From Swiss-Prot:
Subunit structure: Part of the 30S ribosomal subunit.
GO molecular function, one term: structural constituent of ribosome
Protein's recorded name: Small ribosomal subunit protein uS17
GO CC, alphabetical: cytosolic small ribosomal subunit
Protein backbone atom coordinates (compact mmCIF):
# COMPACT_ATOMS: atom_id res chain seq x y z
CA UNK A 1 0.00 0.00 0.00
CA UNK A 2 1.43 3.36 -0.97
CA UNK A 3 1.41 6.39 1.27
CA UNK A 4 -1.17 8.16 -0.95
CA UNK A 5 -3.69 5.34 -0.47
CA UNK A 6 -3.21 5.47 3.29
CA UNK A 7 -4.32 9.11 3.29
CA UNK A 8 -7.52 8.24 1.43
CA UNK A 9 -8.87 6.23 4.35
CA UNK A 10 -12.10 7.39 5.93
CA UNK A 11 -11.68 9.46 9.10
CA UNK A 12 -14.49 10.25 11.52
CA UNK A 13 -14.74 12.41 14.63
CA UNK A 14 -16.73 11.34 17.65
CA UNK A 15 -17.04 11.01 21.41
CA UNK A 16 -15.81 8.06 23.48
CA UNK A 17 -18.76 6.56 25.36
CA UNK A 18 -17.15 3.37 26.66
CA UNK A 19 -13.54 2.63 27.53
CA UNK A 20 -11.51 0.24 29.69
CA UNK A 21 -14.22 -2.41 29.76
CA UNK A 22 -12.35 -4.48 27.19
CA UNK A 23 -8.64 -4.38 26.50
CA UNK A 24 -7.54 -2.12 23.61
CA UNK A 25 -11.12 -1.41 22.52
CA UNK A 26 -13.19 1.74 22.90
CA UNK A 27 -16.69 2.57 21.71
CA UNK A 28 -17.03 5.87 19.84
CA UNK A 29 -20.34 7.57 18.97
CA UNK A 30 -20.30 9.53 15.72
CA UNK A 31 -23.12 11.98 14.99
CA UNK A 32 -24.13 12.77 11.43
CA UNK A 33 -26.77 15.21 10.33
CA UNK A 34 -28.92 14.16 7.39
CA UNK A 35 -31.69 15.86 5.52
CA UNK A 36 -35.05 14.16 4.96
CA UNK A 37 -35.54 13.61 1.24
CA UNK A 38 -39.20 14.65 1.09
CA UNK A 39 -39.64 17.18 3.89
CA UNK A 40 -36.17 18.68 4.05
CA UNK A 41 -35.93 18.62 7.84
CA UNK A 42 -32.48 17.89 9.24
CA UNK A 43 -32.15 15.09 11.76
CA UNK A 44 -29.31 13.51 13.70
CA UNK A 45 -28.16 9.95 13.12
CA UNK A 46 -25.83 8.42 15.68
CA UNK A 47 -23.68 5.38 15.04
CA UNK A 48 -21.44 3.53 17.47
CA UNK A 49 -18.10 2.15 16.30
CA UNK A 50 -15.81 -0.33 18.03
CA UNK A 51 -12.34 1.20 17.75
CA UNK A 52 -8.89 -0.29 18.36
CA UNK A 53 -6.89 1.70 20.94
CA UNK A 54 -3.46 0.06 21.09
CA UNK A 55 -1.96 2.34 23.77
CA UNK A 56 -5.22 2.62 25.77
CA UNK A 57 -4.98 6.42 25.98
CA UNK A 58 -8.62 7.36 25.32
CA UNK A 59 -10.97 7.90 28.25
CA UNK A 60 -14.75 8.35 28.46
CA UNK A 61 -16.00 11.73 27.11
CA UNK A 62 -12.84 12.35 25.06
CA UNK A 63 -13.29 13.73 21.55
CA UNK A 64 -11.30 11.53 19.17
CA UNK A 65 -10.57 11.10 15.49
CA UNK A 66 -10.72 7.53 14.18
CA UNK A 67 -9.38 6.08 10.94
CA UNK A 68 -10.58 3.18 8.84
CA UNK A 69 -8.31 0.12 8.83
CA UNK A 70 -8.31 -3.54 7.93
CA UNK A 71 -10.74 -5.71 9.92
CA UNK A 72 -9.18 -6.38 13.32
CA UNK A 73 -12.08 -8.47 14.63
CA UNK A 74 -15.72 -9.15 13.86
CA UNK A 75 -16.77 -5.59 14.76
CA UNK A 76 -13.52 -3.54 14.79
CA UNK A 77 -12.74 -1.80 11.48
CA UNK A 78 -11.43 1.49 12.85
CA UNK A 79 -8.40 2.47 14.91
CA UNK A 80 -7.72 5.48 17.10
CA UNK A 81 -5.94 8.14 15.06
CA UNK A 82 -5.82 11.13 17.41
CA UNK A 83 -7.26 12.39 20.70
CA UNK A 84 -8.63 15.86 19.92
CA UNK A 85 -9.66 16.91 23.43
CA UNK A 86 -9.75 15.13 26.75
CA UNK A 87 -12.65 14.93 29.17
CA UNK A 88 -10.85 17.18 31.67
CA UNK A 89 -10.48 19.89 28.98
CA UNK A 90 -14.22 19.77 28.32
CA UNK A 91 -15.02 20.09 32.05
CA UNK A 92 -12.73 23.12 32.39
CA UNK A 93 -14.43 24.87 29.45
CA UNK A 94 -17.88 24.21 30.97
CA UNK A 95 -16.93 25.98 34.21
Amino acid sequence: MTFENRNNRKTLTGKVVSAQKTQKTIIVEVDRYKKHLLYGKRFKKTKRYAVHDEAQVAKVNDMVMIMETRPLSKTKHFRLYQVLSTASDVEKEAK
